[in-house]
Amino acid sequence: MSARTKARKRALDVLYVADIRGESIPATLAVEQQRAAAEPDRQASWQYAREIAEGFVAHQDEIDELIETYSVNWTLARMPAVDRAILRIGIWEILFNADVPHGVAISESVDLASSLSTDESASFVNGMLARIAATQA
């Protein structure tokens, strides 16, 4: 597993935990930073995970509005928390990280959904992110 793939999973953990516990993302990041500092092998993935989470916080309103706009028959509150977190990461990478090709952002998000969410989540995530990426072409 690449460092970036691990970082996406760590960012997912941060966004998911903050969402489920009703905590702020910066507070959850601070806890994760303490864990990462205690485990030097986590440092490589930690840097990008933090960039993703902080990037989402900076653009949360815009990203969440896109999710609401492009999800058919689903509101943010109604979709599984893990799907919300995955979509937030994927959209941030598509819109705000020029170093990540759209196809990679979509593929990585779909892989996370396939392994961590419902049977329908992978196709839902794929469709949403593909539509959003198409607006950026």
Curated annotation (Swiss-Prot):
It holds the Pfam family NusB. Keywords: RNA-binding, Transcription, Transcription antitermination, Transcription regulation. GO terms for molecular function: RNA binding. The keyword Transcription regulation applies. One of its GO terms (cellular component) is cytosol. It comes from the Bacteria. GO terms for biological process: DNA-templated transcription termination; transcription antitermination. Belongs to the NusB family. PANTHER family: ANTITERMINATION NUSB DOMAIN-CONTAINING PROTEIN (PTHR11078:SF3), N UTILIZATION SUBSTANCE PROTEIN B-RELATED (PTHR11078). Involved in transcription antitermination. Required for transcription of ribosomal RNA (rRNA) genes. Binds specifically to the boxA antiterminator sequence of the ribosomal RNA (rrn) operons. This is Transcription antitermination protein NusB. The gene is nusB.
